A protein has these predicted regions:
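Sec/Tat-exported extracytoplasmic proteins
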Residues: 94, 98-105, 120, 142-150, ...
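Noncatalytic regulatory segments and standalone regulatory/sensor domains
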Residues: 189-190, 199-265
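Active-site-adjacent structural segments surrounding the nucleophilic cysteine of cysteine proteases
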Residues: 3-135, 178, 186-189, 203, ...
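Mid-length scaffold segments of soluble, non-membrane domains
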Residues: 125-160, 164-168
Length: 265
C-alpha cells in the first residue's frame, strides 16, 4: 500500500511540474527544432544564390533538398498588442514581410506597426473593410499599394509547386483555416482565418514558415501535409461572415497561394 501511495504521489507531482512548466518545455522543444534548420539565404530572381554569381539554371527540387529564405520577421501584433487592428492583420503583415524580403530592407516592430495602420486605412478606402482579406484582395494590395508588377494568385497547386517557387527565391503567402494547423502558440482554438509566409522547407519535407500569428512564429516548422491541407482562401472578404459556423465556412474556400515576383513599377 505504501508503494502505491508513493507511486501516486510521484505521479501527481510529476504531472503538476509538467503542467506548470508546459510552456517552457514547448519553447525548449521549439528552439531545439529551429537549431537544425538550414541557414537562411537570399536568392536572386534567376534562382541562383547570391553567394554564387554564375548564372546557372534554377535548382530543381531533386538538386536542392532544403532551403530557408531570409524573410525578416515581426508578428502581426508588433508590441504584443492583440487589440484591433492587429488581431486581424495577418494578411497585411505577411505582405509587409515579403515586400521587405524582395527589397532587402531591414524591419522593426515600429515599421510594421506603422505599415499595418497605413494598410488598414488603404483597404478601407479600396475595399470598404480590412477583415478577412481574400487572396485576390491581398494580391491587389501587393500590386497597387506596394507596386509589384506581377503578383500571381495560383489555384489547384501542389506541395511541389510551392517548393519550386521557394527554390526560385519567391516566398509564398498562404491563406489558411487557422484552426487546422494545430499551432499551440495561437490563442486557442486559433484563428478561423489566417495568413502566413512559407519561406523554405527541410530535408525531411517540412515547411519552414514565418507565422505572424505568434511572437514565436519566426522559422516555425509545420508538417507539409498538415499545412497544405489547411490552405483555404476566405470565401468572401469583409468585416463579418453571416454564417452560423465560420469554422466550416472557411473550409469551403479554395486552395490558393500568392506569389510575388520581385519587380516594381
Amino acid at each position: 500500500m505504501k508503494k502505491f501511495l508513493v507511486f501516486i504521489t510521484i505521479f501527481i507531482a510529476t504531472f503538476l511540474v509538467l503542467l506548470v512548466f508546459r510552456t517552457d518545455i514547448q519553447d525548449l522543444t521549439l528552439e531545439w527544432e529551429k537549431n537544425g534548420l538550414p541557414e537562411e539565404t537570399r536568392i536572386v530572381s534567376t534562382g541562383v544564390p547570391t553567394k554564387n554569381p554564375t548564372a546557372l539554371p534554377a535548382p530543381s527540387i531533386v538538386e536542392f533538398s532544403e532551403i530557408n529564405l531570409a524573410v525578416p520577421f515581426v508578428p502581426q501584433a508588433p508590441y504584443a498588442d492583440w487589440s484591433l487592428p492587429y488581431q486581424e492583420a495577418c494578411e497585411e503583415t505577411s505582405a509587409i514581410l515579403v515586400n521587405k524580403f524582395h527589397k532587402n530592407e531591414s524591419i522593426t516592430s515600429e515599421i510594421v506597426k506603422n505599415e499595418i495602420l497605413k494598410l488598414v486605412e488603404w483597404q478601407k478606402r479600396k475595399f470598404g473593410y480590412y477583415f478577412h482579406t481574400t487572396a485576390e484582395e491581398t494580391a491587389i494590395m501587393l500590386r497597387q499599394y506596394f507596386g509589384y508588377k506581377r503578383v500571381d494568385v495560383l489555384r489547384d497547386i501542389t506541395i511541389n509547386d510551392i517548393k519550386s517557387h521557394l527554390l526560385a527565391g519567391r516566398p509564398v503567402i498562404v491563406p489558411l483555416a487557422g484552426q487546422l494547423v494545430g499551432n499551440p502558440y495561437y490563442r486557442q482554438p486559433g484563428p478561423v482565418y489566417h495568413m502566413l509566409v512559407i519561406k523554405g522547407f527541410t530535408k525531411d519535407g517540412k515547411f519552414i514558415t514565418n507565422d505572424v500569428g505568434t511572437k514565436r512564429g519566426q522559422n516555425y516548422v509545420y508538417d507539409a501535409n498538415v499545412l497544405f491541407n489547411a490552405i483555404h482562401d476566405a470565401p468572401t472578404g469583409g468585416d463579418g461572415w453571416s454564417v452560423n459556423n465560420p469554422e466550416d465556412y472557411i473550409k469551403t474556400g479554395g486552395k490558393v497561394i500568392i506569389v510575388v515576383y520581385p519587380t516594381h513599377n
